[in-house]
């Protein structure tokens, strides 16, 4: 199968199973696996939308504990003896009586060879019905009137998008934090917490008059509906929409006076602590979202990230590198503890920032990272970027159910040839040990199960594996055996039912050492994304230069192992088609905002890394290596062009998509024509059409993206053009002149090496056999 056909085949599997593997054949020994350089890994999107997939309305057939593997197309079924053999533990299990008519031609859906992914709606049985989803809005009132009004309007609109039975609560904060008692209709009533004081969970519960609703010994059983006292603060939308709207509309700016040389006192930590404490009491393990809307940094109480005085700047990357950080470590510890509490209780924390300055996202990032919450960084709540992104959180499916799952867990089972080493994504470990757990650790490891409080159809996870076989005389025969992995995702559907989605993936094991089909099974796109996740995971704990050196070392080793070359002859270096783009991906990854913090604030870095760890292969690749399209009068429609400074031409329009920004760039001549108004004159309809085409294409790109990208239109030489220039390969710089003799392309003033120079060095090092 040629590379293009293979790529289409892998894309079809991704559409069906929501999974892409770095290697589509597994090495048969640990020694062989270590020589692959890139680990065996999967980018898995558990809730990928599949409109044609059946939803089975019965409980799955499972293997005996402790295995609990689910019946799947890779299981051996003996229809005469009415048994099936689990591929993971090789145990024989009886088929249930309703499967008595099973035969080679009559198979239940879960055994059909194409149903490698199947979803069950689990019967409720004796379990109590889960409570409806809960939304607690935590609103910052220390902001300008227009920004607060825009936020209030967005919140009022969101009420109409919630399921009628959803419970809603409101907490506002400035100098003090206030919990609004929506259930009290005589007048506006709220409980006030001092912003400078740290409250223990027990104190919050006592002050709000909430009795301990659940015994700690029952962590996995959701509670029945809203428990008495909590019903004063959390009410169903259909019952209390009028009261909630009223409270929101009457919200005023924080009345505390702010001197010109001071920041407003903002007790973000106390407000979040109260929200977590309120839900922890009565709604443990119930689907809930705490949605924080903040327009500035915490300056008061626990979790403060910057002082009250404006002359004291908020920390930068430079300050963190030099350890010049007064509040950072204490704030991180405070928010991390709160994130662990929220994750333990099954509650999601979303952070929406509407501010030109930093708000402390770096310190708070694990609130979203541990709980599967959204993170959004915008300049203001008045921006369309915030309004449209916020509304998209409440997108619904064809049955009018919210496209979000609550309280999910993901468990991985493997056959004896494979072991799972860890997961990188928005989850926390459930510390579950099994025979599938590997000896090494990559990401969140030493477990085969993880908890995701929030999960949506785009949530993707990088899951990493190692080979268990030591090799030797008993090594497997090629083509006779498959390594199989099963992913079990339990979650609370927004309709209130519990669902289980099962994906089972099997791949052949390679033959003896040096099997050429192993190299042909390499998916360079999935591999680039899996390596990017590891690099970002390392960047959170290691120094930036160390991470870049690791990326370079891995790339040199991979090329040294899989390229064709004569030793010490760089001109003989050749890569197979399914490896050729990988060095380019790594070149752009090491220049990207994920690993280069220059020109980005710590908050922006936290935001970009958060989004990378949420998206699937296609979207992650756009972030790593943006796409560039060119429009000109010579060609109809768009032409994909190289992400290179040579692509900038005076008579062309460029459309750049970096996932976070969508930019339309007018070449010098095009900009002059536009300013002269040619597009409005008769006879120049072609220029008008040329100017409109990229806008149409940009609208299509924006249509279903979350978070909504920033849209920029600029001209050659304009200040906004820097967004484009920073992403291009600098093949023409002030030191090189026109690379390849071209004089029309843009000169980029940078000391960064070009892709050509990078590749020259890579080939030289790869053929010399040194890393």
UniProtKB/Swiss-Prot annotation:
Indicate which residues the UniProt annotation says bind Zn(2+). Answer: 63, 67, 86, 89
**InterPro entries the UniProt entry points to:** ADF-H/Gelsolin-like_dom_sf (IPR029006), Gelsolin-like_dom (IPR007123), Gelsolin-like_dom_sf (IPR036180), Sec23 (IPR037364), Sec23/24_helical_dom (IPR006900), Sec23/24_helical_dom_sf (IPR036175), Sec23/24_trunk_dom (IPR006896), Sec23_24_beta_S (IPR012990)
Pfam families, alphabetized:
Gelsolin, Sec23_BS, Sec23_helical, Sec23_trunk, zf-Sec23_Sec24
Q: Which UniProt keywords apply?
A: Cytoplasm, Cytoplasmic vesicle, Endoplasmic reticulum, ER-Golgi transport, Golgi apparatus, Membrane, Metal-binding, Protein transport, Transport, Zinc
Tell me the superkingdom of the source. Eukaryota
Any one GO cellular component localisation term in the record: endoplasmic reticulum exit site
Q: Where does the UniProt entry say this protein principally localizes?
A: cytoplasm
CDD domains, per database record:
Sec23-like, Sec23_C
GO MF assignments: GTPase activator activity; zinc ion binding
Give the UniProt record's GO annotations in the biological process aspect. COPII-coated vesicle cargo loading; intracellular protein transport
- How does the entry describe its membrane topology? Peripheral membrane protein
The protein's location, in the record's own words, is: Cytoplasm; Cytoplasmic vesicle, COPII-coated vesicle membrane; Endoplasmic reticulum membrane; Golgi apparatus membrane
**Which regions span the lipid bilayer?**
none
Its quaternary organisation is: The COPII coat is composed of at least 5 proteins: the sec23/24 complex, the sec13/31 complex, and the protein sar1.
Q: Which family does it belong to?
A: Belongs to the SEC23/SEC24 family. SEC23 subfamily.
Protein task: Component of the coat protein complex II (COPII) which promotes the formation of transport vesicles from the endoplasmic reticulum (ER). The coat has two main functions, the physical deformation of the endoplasmic reticulum membrane into vesicles and the selection of cargo molecules.
Report the protein name in the record. Answer: Protein transport protein sec23
Q: Which organism is it from?
A: Aspergillus terreus (strain NIH 2624 / FGSC A1156)
List the lineage, top down.
Answer: Eukaryota, Fungi, Dikarya, Ascomycota, Pezizomycotina
Q: Which gene encodes it?
A: sec23
């Amino acid at each position: 199968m040629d590379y293009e056909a293979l790529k289409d085949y892998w894309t079809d599997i991704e559409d069906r199973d929501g999974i892409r593997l770095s290697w589509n054949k597994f090495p048969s020994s640990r020694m062989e696996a270590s020589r692959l350089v890139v680990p065996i890994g999967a980018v898995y999107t558990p809730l990928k939308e599949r409109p044609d997939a059946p939803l089975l309305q019965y409980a799955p057939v499972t293997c005996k504990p402790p295995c609990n593997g689910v019946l799947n197309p890779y299981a051996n079924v003996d229809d005469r003896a009415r048994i099936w053999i689990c591929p993971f533990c090789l145990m024989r299990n009886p088929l249930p009586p309703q499967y008595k008519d099973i035969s080679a031609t009559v198979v239940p859906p879960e055994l059909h060879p194409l149903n490698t992914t199947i979803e069950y709606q689990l019967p409720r049985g004796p379990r109590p019905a889960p409570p409806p989803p809960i939304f607690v809005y935590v609103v910052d009132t220390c902001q300008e009137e227009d920004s607060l009004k825009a936020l209030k309007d967005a919140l009022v609109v969101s009420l109409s998008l919630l399921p009628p039975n959803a419970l809603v609560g409101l907490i506002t904060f400035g100098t003090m934090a206030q919990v609004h008692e929506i259930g009290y209709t005589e007048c506006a009533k709220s409980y006030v917490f001092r912003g400078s004081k740290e409250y223990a969970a027990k104190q919050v519960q006592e002050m709000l008059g909430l009795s301990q609703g659940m015994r700690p010994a029952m962590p996995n059983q959701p509670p029945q509906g809203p428990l008495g006292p909590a019903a004063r603060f959390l009410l169903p939308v259909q019952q209390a929409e009028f009261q909630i709207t009223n409270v929101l509309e009457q919200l005023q700016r924080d009345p505390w006076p702010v001197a010109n040389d001071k920041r407003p006192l903002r007790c973000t930590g106390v407000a979040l602590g109260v929200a977590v404490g309120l839900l922890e009491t009565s709604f443990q393990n119930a689907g809930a979202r705490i949605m924080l809307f903040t327009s500035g940094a915490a300056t008061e109480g626990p979790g403060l990230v910057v002082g009250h005085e404006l002359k004291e700047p908020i920390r930068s990357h430079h300050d963190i590198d030099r350890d010049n950080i007064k509040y950072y470590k204490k704030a991180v510890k405070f928010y991390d503890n709160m994130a662990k509490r929220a994750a333990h209780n099954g509650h999601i924390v979303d952070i929406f920032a509407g501010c030109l300055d930093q708000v402390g996202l770096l310190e708070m990032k694990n609130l979203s990272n541990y709980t599967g919450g959204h993170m959004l960084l915008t300049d203001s709540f008045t921006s369309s970027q915030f309004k449209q992104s916020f509304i998209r959180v409440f997108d619904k499916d064809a049955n009018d159910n919210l496209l979000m799952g609550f309280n999910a867990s993901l468990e991985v089972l493997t056959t004896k040839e494979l072991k799972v080493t860890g997961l990188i994504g928005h989850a926390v470990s459930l510390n579950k040990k099994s025979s599938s757990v590997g000896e090494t650790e990559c990401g969140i490891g030493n477990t085969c199960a993880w908890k995701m409080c929030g999960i949506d159809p785009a949530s993707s996870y990088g899951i990493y594996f190692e080979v268990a076989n030591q090799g030797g005389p008993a090594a497997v025969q090629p083509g006779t055996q498959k390594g199989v992995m099963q992913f079990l995702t339990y979650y609370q559907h927004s309709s209130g039912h519990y669902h289980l989605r099962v994906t089972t993936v099997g791949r052949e094991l390679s033959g003896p050492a040096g099997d050429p089909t192993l190299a042909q099974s390499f998916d360079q796109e999935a591999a680039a994304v899996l390596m990017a996740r590891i690099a970002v995971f390392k960047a959170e704990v290691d120094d930036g230069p160390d991470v870049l050196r690791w990326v370079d070392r891995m790339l040199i080793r991979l090329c040294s192992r899989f390229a064709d070359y004569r030793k010490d002859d760089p001109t003989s270096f050749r890569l197979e088609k399914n490896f050729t783009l990988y060095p380019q991906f790594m070149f752009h990854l090491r220049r990207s905002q994920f690993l280069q913090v220059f020109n980005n604030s710590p908050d922006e870095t936290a935001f970009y890394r958060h989004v990378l760890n949420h998206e699937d292969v296609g979207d992650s690749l756009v972030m790593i290596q943006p796409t560039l399209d060119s429009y000109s009068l010579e060609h109809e429609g768009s032409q994909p062009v190289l992400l290179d400074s040579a692509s900038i031409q005076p008579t062309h329009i460029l459309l750049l998509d970096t996932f976070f920004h969508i930019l339309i760039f007018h070449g010098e001549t095009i900009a002059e024509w536009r300013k002269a108004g040619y597009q409005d004159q008769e006879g120049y309809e072609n220029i008008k059409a040329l100017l409109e085409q990229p806008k149409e294409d940009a609208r299509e790109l924006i249509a279903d993206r979350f978070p909504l990208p920033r849209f920029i239109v600029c001209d050659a030489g304009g200040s906004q053009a820097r967004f484009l220039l920073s992403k291009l390969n600098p093949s023409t710089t002030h030191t090189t002149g026109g690379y390849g003799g071209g004089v029309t392309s843009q000169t980029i003033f940078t000391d960064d090496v070009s892709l050509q120079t990078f590749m020259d060095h890579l080939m030289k090092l790869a053929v010399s056999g040194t890393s």
